[in-house]
Amino acid sequence: MSKKVFIKTFGCQMNEYDSDKMADVLGAAQGYEPTDDPEQADLILFNTCSVREKAQEKVFSDLGRVKHLKDKGVLIGVGGCVASQEGEEIIKRAPFVDVVFGPQTLHRLPELLNARAAKARPQVDISFPEIEKFDHLPPARVEGASAFVSIMEGCSKYCSYCVVPYTRGEEVSRPFEDVLVEVAGLADQGVKEVTLLGQNVNAYLGAMGDTAEKADFALLLEYVAEIPGIERIRFTTSHPNEFTPRLIEAYAKIPKLVSHLHLPVQHGSDRILMAMKRGYTAMEYKSTIRKLRAIRPDMAMSSDFIVGFPGETEEDFQKMMKLIDDVRFDNSFSFIFSPRPGTPAANLHDDTPHEVKLRRLQELQAVINRNILEISQERVGTVQRLLVEGVSKRDGSELMGRTECNRVVNFPGHERLIGQMIDVKITEARTYTLRGEVVMGEVTTAVG
């Protein structure tokens, strides 16, 4: 009987990718099979996020919920950014944890588990062996028509509020050829859409063979687009400072590059952006968007926003609201500032009452939601090209797919359509999703 591993993932798409790789490593080395039920697991892993305090504390709450399973001999591990940040402190706070490992050492999981058994004590490895992780991962195994591919790790921007450079290290790019080989392997398995991942993905500079030359992100996109079977290319997350003219021009040269971009701005006040050490102004950010939309008028934009950064005044907040109106974002991830230990912003004086921050967050989200609904309503009556991803989460009798602009569409259809690119006419708009019906025959397809 095979051993079972339960993996709970917190945070970003990079963590989702890493969780898949944990399962692959454990399956290849020790025969583990994934399970969705922690009660059936022989090994429970938490792949953690430390971007906000709430996410970090939830990890320890969840650890408490599975502690009783130790009586059955279940092994428990903590990986990801909380593991990287806290290290041995996790063992002190939760001594029943067996292994602690960082994002860069997940490939060593089998070794850590073997050492735990041999030495009868918890094992911790939160080192930064740079790109070694990718050299020791088994070939990607996927189910479905879309897949993530990590092309780089870490971030070297050191924004004043962010823990990523401390938990994932500085920027390290995978070799150019390695990325192309992985994408080609996924295409051979039927993948039609790839999402290229990195904390600062557009800073990619990958080694090209034994030469001193480096491939930038725009060149990588061109080569990925040439791989047979790949029909759509997405990427996340990008930094405004790295959005070069070459990358903007890629949207004119590469039709497979989708008309959707997640480009975190974080704020709309130049004073706050400077305090955040973001390295650009609101005007420079909007200039990048204007250039992109000159090439792709239908470009859908999403962003991250931090409300209540230390020293944020009502005037600063209104500047952020103006930027939101000017850009007309299609989606956002918005949060109240959460001071992270060890970052410069954690030491800044903050005298804004929490109720003021909460009111601002609610006001911001209300405007974003209004924009999202308006954009959704504009799609009604158009025909959208979808990649059908699976059964609808809203209604098990329907299917769901995603438009080029990253909008989910639910529609009635046969399961044989899963994994296919199809045309769907939009019949109804909701704030975050659309409803539609499959188009039969030849119909002019709108991009969306």
UniProtKB/Swiss-Prot annotation:
Cellular component, GO annotation = cytosol
The TRAM domain, residue ranges: 377-440
Domain (Radical SAM core) ranges: 141-374
Keyword terms, alphabetized: 4Fe-4S, Cytoplasm, Iron, Iron-sulfur, Metal-binding, S-adenosyl-L-methionine, Transferase, tRNA processing
* Protein name per its UniProtKB record: tRNA-2-methylthio-N(6)-dimethylallyladenosine synthase
Q: What is its EC number?
A: 2.8.4.3
Q: Where in the cell is it found?
A: Cytoplasm
Q: Which positions does UniProt annotate for [4Fe-4S] cluster 1 binding?
A: 12, 49, 81
Q: Which domain of life is it from?
A: Bacteria
Q: How does it assemble?
A: Monomer.
Query: Which cofactor names does the annotation list?
Result: [4Fe-4S] cluster
